[in-house]
């Protein structure tokens, strides 16, 4: 599914004009992007969490030459689906509501990978 497909779906389901649907979808993605750029976690109940993690620099190895190289520190984006989404993907009916279903996905205590 592409961004254009999402815009089309919003247009068909909500009844906004295509221009309005496109503007809304763009605003949502811009907000998500800006939040992640600030390093903040995004938690969408019933869907999942987007988490920015800082990875430390480390020594790696060139697999072709065996030479050691330094891999610089960087930020990585991870997505952790909610249990509700996992169940839906597997065709399971969940008794859980979407409210609070992601509360067990707290990443704060995890270290660098």
UniProtKB/Swiss-Prot annotation:
Q: Which PROSITE patterns match?
A: HISTONE_LIKE
Tell me the SUPFAM superfamilies matching this sequence: IHF-like DNA-binding proteins
Q: Which SMART domains match?
A: BHL (SM00411)
Keyword set, alphabetical order? DNA recombination, DNA-binding, Transcription, Transcription regulation, Translation regulation
**Membrane-spanning residues where?**
none
Give GO MF terms, alphabetically.
DNA binding; structural constituent of chromatin
Q: Where is the composition biased (Acidic residues)?
A: 93-113
**Where do the record's region annotations for Disordered lie?**
87-113
Gene3D superfamilies, from UniProt?
IHF-like DNA-binding proteins (4.10.520.10)
CDD domains (UniProt xref): IHF_A
This protein's GO CC annotations: cytosol
Among InterPro entries, the record links this protein to: Hist_DNA-bd, Histone-like_DNA-bd_CS, IHF-like_DNA-bd_dom_sf, IHF_alpha
Query: What job does this protein perform?
Result: This protein is one of the two subunits of integration host factor, a specific DNA-binding protein that functions in genetic recombination as well as in transcriptional and translational control.
- Spell out the PANTHER family in the cross-references: DNA-BINDING PROTEIN HU, INTEGRATION HOST FACTOR SUBUNIT ALPHA
> Would you identify the family this protein belongs to, as annotated?
Belongs to the bacterial histone-like protein family.
NCBIfam families the UniProt entry points to:
himA, PRK00285.1
| Quaternary organization | Heterodimer of an alpha and a beta chain.
Name of this chain's protein = Integration host factor subunit alpha
The gene from which this protein is expressed is ihfA
